[in-house]
Amino acid sequence: MNSLVKLLARSPLLTPDLDHYLVRAALVIIFVLFGYQKWFEYEARVLIPYISHGPLVFWLYPVFGIRGASWFLGVVEWLVGVLLFIGFWNRTSGLLGAVGSIITFLSTVTIIPFMPNAWDATAGGFPAIAADTTAFLIKDLVLLAASVYLLKEDALRLSGAERPTSAFTILVRTLGRSGLFAKDLDYSLLRGSMVIVFFFFGYTKWHEYGARAMVPFISHGPLLFWLYPAFGFRGAARFLGAFEWFTAMLLFSGFWNSRLGILGAIASVLTFVSTLTIIPFIPDGWAASAGGFPAMAGPVAFLMKDVVLLAVSIYLLKQDVERAQVPAIGQERMPHIARTLESGERTG
């Protein structure tokens, strides 16, 4: 294990801000692609059950109508994507984009308790996530945690600016008092959300409906197709379920043992590399009614969120490699100027 840690430490993995840039870029991709499909009729129809049962978005239909609600969301998502992209250079824009991203994924995650047929009845209901609804939404837990991570990073960098604007000084101080700057908050949220995702998706693989839902993905996966010849229809799903639960346990153990966390993060990286490489090969991945690429159809829209989950896996891997090298695990990374916010000391 020591050799693995040293090997990873010598790799580009520990490049400063690599994880930050990957998470930011992944969220930009998500907002651009999902925003794009909101302009088409097929996506407006797909959104109906989500908006209708969303406690934070149900008002969109009375205000804008079916197509108007979809267009409104498209504008918002593109705006958030642009702000996050500008955040590579301008932390103020990045902070605003992160706030918009948090609101977006709070809106989607809160749909889950109210969505009809959110849990598969053939598998006994909860915690068997329905393949066509909850499975799509549950990944947003990780996207929400990633948004909190970016908000914290941008707030800390803004707080260290030489001349922050007064308005944003107040905003950053408010965020500091809210507990956003708590040590390892973002790290814990990202790790916890990944554990939840692996648990739920691993659970579905042990049931018939989950095995059937996997057929197009495994059949067209360049890194997964061998599972059917090796294990058969149900065996392939069970193999993946066991692997996903094993990954979840390693990631969960990473809260206390960074070396186990490294193994979990590596398994997570392998998982999402395997799923993302399906995208170029899966049939009907792009909506023909909207002209094809970049208008995502159901299977690609489901897989595309794994861009963020892969970036988060790399973040966790980097964090655990750093912690495995340092005896004082989880040393405070917060600048002094951020630590003084709660005391009300004026900075800048």
Which sequence ranges carry the predicted segments?
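Membrane-interface extramembranous regions
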Residues: 1-348
